């Protein structure tokens, strides 16, 4: 079993929800946890710290990807020049993989500093994800995790991309 969480929004989290997740994990022991973005409410140090402490306390493997709330909103300079610095300080790489007994999970960063409210992936990300999934043993369930629906910018969109997008579709 895999546990999927999203929009934890540490900084505005509700203790009753946190306790319910902890209790669920203790009772059911999922194979792994996937958190598909919005770990924090406002991308602040204390919020990332609290989220990391919480996830570590579950004592289960986990994969996280950033959400639009995980980059600074009001600190425009930081949003444009170092949007993921705190995220990376606590969770490392923006795009990771997690392999368990039954699952192979690819985390894709769909957040962009300029268009932070819309999901976006590049053709390079699509190709990289395809290559990762292409080499996974057939007995694994393959999953791709991201925060928002994908948006391909008009300058990268072309009918010739449809076969590429179709290849990666699960």
Task: List each language-model region with its residue ranges.
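His/acidic metal-ligating clusters that form di-metal
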Residues: 26-32, 118-170
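Active-site neighborhood of phospho(di)ester-bond hydrolases with catalytic His/Asp-centered motifs
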Residues: 4-6, 33-38, 62-68, 109, ...
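Residues at the starts of beta-strands that form the adenosine-phosphate
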Residues: 1, 31-32, 61, 104, ...
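Active-site environment of divalent metal-dependent phosphoester hydrolases
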Residues: 11-13, 41-46, 68-76, 113-117, ...
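Short, basic/glycine-rich phosphate-binding loops at helix/coil junctions
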Residues: 3-4, 104-112, 149-155
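Extended active-site neighborhood of metal-dependent phosphoesterases/phosphodiesterases
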Residues: 49-131, 136
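Alpha-helical membrane-targeting segments
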Residues: 17, 75-86, 159-168
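N-terminal active-site segment of His-dependent metallophosphoesterases
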Residues: 1-57, 73-74
């Amino acid at each position: 079993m895999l546990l999927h969480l999203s929009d934890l929004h540490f900084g505005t989290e509700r203790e009753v929800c946190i306790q319910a997740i902890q209790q669920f994990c203790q009772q059911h022991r999922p194979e792994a946890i996937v958190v598909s973005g919005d770990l924090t409410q406002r991308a602040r140090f204390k919020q990332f710290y609290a989220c990391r402490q919480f996830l570590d306390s579950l004592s289960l493997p986990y994969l996280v990807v950033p959400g639009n709330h995980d980059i600074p909103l009001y600190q425009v300079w930081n949003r444009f020049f170092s949007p993921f610095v705190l995220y990376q300080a606590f969770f490392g790489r923006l795009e990771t993989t997690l392999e368990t007994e039954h699952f192979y999970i690819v985390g894709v960063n769909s957040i962009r500093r300029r268009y932070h409210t819309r999901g976006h992936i590049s053709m390079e990300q699509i190709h990289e994800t395809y290559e990762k999934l292409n080499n996974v043993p057939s007995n694994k369930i393959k999953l791709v995790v991201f925060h928002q629906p994908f948006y391909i910018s008009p300058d990268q969109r072309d009918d010739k991309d449809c076969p590429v997008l179709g290849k990666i579709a699960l």
